[in-house]
Each structure stands twice: as C-alpha cells, then as structure tokens.
Amino acid sequence: MQISLTVLLCLATGIVSWQALSNSELFSKLSLSPYRVKHNKEIYRIWSHTLVHADMGHLFFNLFALFSFGRAVEHYMPTALFALLYLGAAAFATLPALKKHGDNIYYTSVGASGAVSAVMMLYMFMFPTSELLFFFILP
C-alpha cells in the first residue's frame, strides 16, 4: 500500500506546525518574510511558510480542506504533477506579498491557504457536478 502525497503533506504540515506553535524560533525561521527573501535570498521561505500556521484553527481548516479535496485530485493525476501544482501554487500565492512587502522588515505570513485554494479550485474544475456537503449534511 502506497501512502498518498496528500496524506504526506498533511502529516508533515501537522507535525511541523505543531512544533512551530510551541517554538517561536522555528516559527520565525519558516514564516514567509518577503524582506528576507528579497534582501537575504532566503528563497526557501517561499515554500516553508506552508508548513506553519497561525493557530490550531488555521491548521485544522487547511488540513481538512487539503485532505478532503487533495486525495480526489491526486487520484486523477500523476503524483509528480500534483506536487508541482501544490508547490507552484504555494510560490504563486506569495507573489503579491513579495511585491508589496519586499522592503518591509516587519511583515510575515504563514499558512498553506494559497496552495490549498489551488487544490480546491482544481477539484471544482475536475468535478464540476460534485455535490459538496457543508458540515457533512448541508448541500
């Protein structure tokens, strides 16, 4: 049995976020800092910010959405393409912050919402007639 990339992303994000929420140094090191990307060439932050979340609610909703939609999307495309989509969307989502806050030493952001939103949008394009239930009961 092969574990899916979606499950691996959820596990990695959950573990790293859990650790970072109690370790401010790790949280700071992984957060997106457009200033540090631009001036210190810390390019890794374009992707590392997807592994940390502001709080447990933020983490839960991103992981819930990624797990719910990601498994279906990944099932119908090669794993490498799904990985490229996720990483590409994460990078693309940072562009406005990089442009607007590249010289602001105080601005930081965290979370995988940009990448998760891309997975959700792709799900909607792939399965346009799929019925989504809110809170598992409301269509």
At which residue positions do the language-model features occur?
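A detector for small-residue-rich transmembrane helices and their helix-helix packing motifs
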Residues: 1-139
